Amino acid sequence: MNVIVRTGNLFDSKAQALVNPVNCVGVMGKGLAKEFKIRFPEMFRDYADRCRRNEVFPGRPYLYRDLRGTFIVNFSTKNHWKSASRIEDIRDGLLYFIRRYEEWGILSAAFPALGCGNGGLEWDTVGPLMFQLLSQAKIPIEIYAPFGTPEYKLTYPFLCKKCFQRMNGLCRRGRLIWNLVMTT
């Protein structure tokens, strides 16, 4: 299995690329994004400039690289920092990542629980979606669940027991995921 789900500090990961949950207005004022801003000020300036130029959109993560070899995937989980995250934007962004990670040269990646915490989404919905979609990638992936997530919600049986639902409510375990990856 190429996906490991755990709790802990994303910044302790040995993955080549770290995923930063952002909004589209150039603010990294809370949560994990604020820590990214502190640790990577050049990345923050690049992100803020892209937001001013209206180049950051939900469902469309982008890769930031610097001369030191830092790989950060800025993953917009919502339009405005005051807004709630939408599961559709998480799904679309994961599919976009799956289509682009090879082109970006990413060999491994560590993801936070996208849209949870300040985004307002629940791990019970986000976790299975992330696990099932990111399992399509051919690289090692770490997913960091929210602190305090019960151990059983980090396991394969929990993450695969219920297929995430498409907007029309249809669900066909593994097959649905393959169709989403291939057609989106």
Predicted features along the sequence, with ranges:
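Macrodomain-like recognition of ADP-ribose-binding/processing modules
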Residues: 1-184
